Amino acid sequence: MADIKLIARRVESMKHRAYERDTQMANILAVRQGKMVEIFPDMFPEGMSHAMVANFIDVAARDLAEVLAPLPSINCSTTNVTSDNAREFADKRSMIANNYVYTSRLQTQMYPGSDQYFSYGFLPIHVEADWDSKLPRIRVEDPTGVYYERDRFGRLVAYAKRYNKTLIELVNEFPENDRALLGQFGYDQNLNQEIEIIRYMDKDSIVLYVPSRKDLVLSIAANPMGKMTVVVAERPSIDGKARGQFDDVVFVQLARARFANLAMEAAEKSIQAPLVVPDDVLDMPMGPDAIIRTTNPNGVGRVRLDIPAATFQEQSALQSELRLGARYPE
């Protein structure tokens, strides 16, 4: 049986190597959720919870996902087109293959899966045995918290997925480990605190354990298939590291949001600029339709706030850079 200590060290090594990737994935997720202010709080004024520009990255990702998600038609062919038996056999194989896709709801899964593929740069897809229906099930998994290793031939040799569950959920699902999960405080603690659990798989074993509880093993079993039942589709990259399509345009989106804030601030200051009046004005009436008596009406006005025209040109340039970096032309 697998050694949990070796597995835990291997998973920690994979997590350490993917630290930069995890940070970038968290930034992309926050930007797509409209939480750019939480990532770069110094770039936004106080009291502003969202950026004042359209979320271009989210719009582009959804649009590209809708293009990639539709599945091709699945048809099996035969080398002997003159044989009725061969054609019937090919038709039956086509029906079987399409039934696998239909029962797995693969078409429905491909829309969020394609979205995550563009956003994060890779997508795990499981092919698991459904022993109840006696059918293979295809499952698309969220890449967040996924770590994996390949051998020199590019084959997957280790796969780990990080989940978060509340303490009470784990106790209810694994009552035999309640003492180890709850610890010395028992039920007299915050049972809604989230606990990280790891599901690890290789060709020999499948393990579910809790790192924060001294690598407590919740479930361990031999891999019934004897091989990896997951594949990871990756976007092509020059250095072999997974990179999302929008990794390079996050800061361009930030610059657009920053320019929008500055433009709004400039407009506000222009409207609220101090009032300039000639020296002969002794009484300053305020309010709508107020009358200012002066012999020099041309001297009455607000302090001008000159905004360079290049500011608005730069906003257009940032929009072009955003489309170029995201490979999303007009």
Regions found by a protein language model. Give the residues of each.
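Extended, helix-rich architectural segments
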Residues: 1-187, 316
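Charged, low-complexity, helix/coiled-coil-prone segments
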Residues: 2-5, 28-43, 53-62, 83-86, ...
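Structured, contiguous alpha/beta core segments that scaffold functional sites
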Residues: 3-20, 126-283
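Long, contiguous amphipathic alpha-helices that act as assembly "spine/axial" helices in icosahedral shell
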Residues: 42, 53, 61, 88-129, ...
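Long amphipathic alpha-helical segments
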Residues: 55-72, 79-90, 142, 220-230, ...
